[in-house]
Structures are given as C-alpha cells and as structure tokens.
Amino acid sequence: MRRTKAEAAETREAILLAAEQVFLERGVNQSTLTEIACYAGVTRGAIYFHFEDKLDIFQSIIGRARFPQEEIMLQAARFDHPNPLHILEQSIVAALELFATDERQQVVFTIINQRCEYVGEMAPVIDRLKEMRSDVLALFIGLLKVAERRGELASEWSAETAAQILLAMVGGFLNEWLHGEKGFDLIIHGSRVISTVIQSLRAPANIPQ
C-alpha cells in the first residue's frame, strides 16, 4: 500500500526531531544515521527516502528553524520608519522574548554553536550560517543608515560598526544564557542592556527625556 503524503510528512518530521535530539546528545559529527533511525523508530531506508545524507538532515534542521535573527528581519523590514532606532530595539527584544520561550530554537541554536565542528562533511554548513548572519547584519545596517540620514545616530558611530556590535551582543546573550544553564532572566536583562546600548547610539538631541 502506497504511503500517503501525510504519512510521509510525519515520517520526515519524526526523523528531523530525532536528529535534533541525537545531535544534541552526541554532537553532529559523531552522530550516525543508524542512531537517528533508531531514535526515530524508522529504517535507514526511510531516512534515505527523505534525505541524501547527514549533511542534508542538518541543513534541513537549520533551514526550517525559526531563528531570532529571522524574527528581527520580519519586524524591522520597514526601513522608512520614522523612528528606526526604536524599531531596531523592539525587534531585538522581540527576538530575545521568542528565543526564551521556544525550546526548539534553543535546541537548534545549541547544536549549531556547541555541538558541531564545521570540518569535513559539515564544512558546507558554514556558508549557510554566514549567509544568515550577513542578512541580519544588512538589515541592522539598513535601519541604522536611516537613523544616520535623519540625524538620529550619534556622530561617533557608523552604521556598520553599530550593527556589528548589536549583532555580536545578541549572539553573546543567547550563548551566555544557554552556557549558564539559563541562570538569569534573558528577557529582563537583555532588554535593559539593549535599551542602554540603543540610547548610546542616539545623537544627543534625539535622546528621550
């Protein structure tokens, strides 16, 4: 009997969920398709029906995950907003809030940053991660250039430098929170720090009283 599309989709989902757990526990490089198949309760043949190899599985996990960076991109897409620094701050805080409540994001972020060595068969993943970072950086720069044109960005800052610092801070916060076993309130502390940094980016005449 032929499998329905729904059944095939369920099997594919089960494989991806299993892979996430195996990668989290064993590390991507050390994990095998046999382990993933066993965890998912399927055969290796079922895995090869949906994926070419382990790299394809990992790329699929990255591709379907909703990352904080993508949340920022969705919320801050309007470069013509009259208050770009406010939009940028809101977007970053929204990303932190989403991450703090989404265990799936946390698992995938942990795998990407702590459970994979990007050598050998995993080397191609670097290009995808670089592309993601470049997209977010370009978005940040776009918003900050609007602030610059409006005279809202302090003269000692360039849009590029400010964007790089903000992006590094977001990644650093997420890493520190996970490394520290969530020992602090990501939303409260993150929001305060981001607000302080955004304030430091404002030209004196544009700092809210």
Swiss-Prot record:
Residues 32-51 bind DNA. Keywords: DNA-binding, Repressor, Transcription, Transcription regulation. It comes from the Bacteria. Residues 9-69 form the HTH tetR-type domain. One of its GO terms (molecular function) is transcription cis-regulatory region binding. Represses expression of bepDE. PANTHER family: HTH-TYPE TRANSCRIPTIONAL REGULATOR ACRR, HTH-TYPE TRANSCRIPTIONAL REGULATOR RUTR. This is HTH-type transcriptional repressor BepR. It comes from Brucella suis biovar 1 (strain 1330). The lineage of its organism: Bacteria, Pseudomonadati, Pseudomonadota, Alphaproteobacteria, Hyphomicrobiales.
